[in-house]
Regions:
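A late-sequence structural motif
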Residues: 265-307
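A short LG(V/I)-centered, amphipathic sequence patch enriched
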Residues: 41-59
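Central regulatory/effector-binding core of bacterial HTH transcription factors
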Residues: 91-155
Length: 307
């Protein structure tokens, strides 16, 4: 049998990144945390943590973290069921961790799960990352589910297709006016690749590859070099486009919601970039996580393209 206190210490060290922070979170001494980790590693006969300035889990440590989180959620479900039949008007609230890309979070994920969270008194802890990288948080045990482009289910997980987010290349009208000047070179739909490559792109962060996909898919440009602004916030990203700072990729869902904001013009409106999304989650889901998965399914079905 695994020792519950040792597992709790392991999870705290991984989540907080250091032994000292874990000790503070658990209200025990640093020596006690160290002893529990050493005892657990000795009992299992392998290293569970990679020591360093930022402590991280080994693959075995990641597996144990997933186990700890699943047990914690199942225990919380049990306690919630017991409290619901008692006179306690304010039962303890559970917390679920998920990883979601910023566009999905703003456009359909949060509106789709808000009602569930309120009905079942659930808390949500969201890790925001690019859709091509959110699965890393699930793999590490940090979250119970993620919105991802990874179609292949990871070990111990299920991958469910959600639908497609369709992105358009857009820019401010003033910037498009500048592009109307005659320009030689490779053109698609009247738009010059030379103009695009000579104009800054507005990009969410360094993991964002949508602009590269647009250039490769519609202009045949692989690994193109062009100036870039990095604006890692959805509202500020759109504001940068409105101000004419450059061109960028925005999903149809967010474009449709821009009724009271300055107009953005679609560049090659009939040539989108489609991003297929999946919901990857634990195969063994506690009840609270099952409810979240159902809400995610329903929200995606209502908002995403079902191609």
């Amino acid at each position: 049998m695994l020792d519950a206190r040792q597992l709790e210490a392991l999870a705290a060290v991984i989540e907080h990144g250091s032994f000292g922070a874990a000790a503070k979170a658990l209200s025990i001494t640093l020596a006690a945390v160290s002893l529990r980790i050493k005892s657990l590693e000795s009992a299992l006969g392998q290293r569970l943590l990679v020591r360093g300035k930022q402590v991280r889990a080994t693959p075995a440590g990641q597996s144990l973290l997933v186990h700890v989180k699943q047990v914690q959620l199942m225990e919380a479900d049990l306690v919630d069921g017991l409290q619901s039949s008692s006179l306690d008007k304010f039962p303890r609230m559970q917390s679920l961790s998920v990883a979601v890309n910023a566009d999905s979070l703003t456009s359909w994920f949060l509106p789709g799960v808000a009602g569930l969270l309120a009905r079942h008194r659930l808390l949500i802890d969201i890790v925001v990352d690019d859709q091509d990288h959110t699965h890393d948080a699930l793999k590490s045990g940090e979250v119970a589910g993620c919105v991802t482009t990874l179609a292949q289910a990871m070990r111990g997980c299920v991958a469910e297709p959600l639908g497609t987010m369709r992105y358009r290349c857009v820019a401010a009208p003033a910037l498009m006016t500048q592009w109307s000047e005659p320009d030689a070179g490779n053109k698609v739909g009247g738009v010059s690749a030379h103009r695009l490559l000579g104009t800054p792109a507005v990009i969410f962060n360094r993991k964002d590859a949508l602009q590269d996909q647009f250039l490769a898919q519609h202009f045949g440009l692989q690994g193109a070099l062009y100036p870039r602004h990095f604006v890692p916030a959805v509202d500020a990203f759109e504001q940068a486009l409105e101000l004419g700072m450059g061109w960028g990729m925005v999903p149809d869902l967010l474009l449709a919601a821009r009724t009271s904001r300055p107009a953005l013009v679609k560049i090659l409106p009939d040539r989108p970039v489609d991003v297929a999304l999946y919901w990857q989650h634990w195969a063994r889901e506690p009840l609270s996580a099952q409810r979240l998965t159902q809400a995610v399914r329903q929200a995606a079905l209502a908002q995403l393209l079902q191609l």
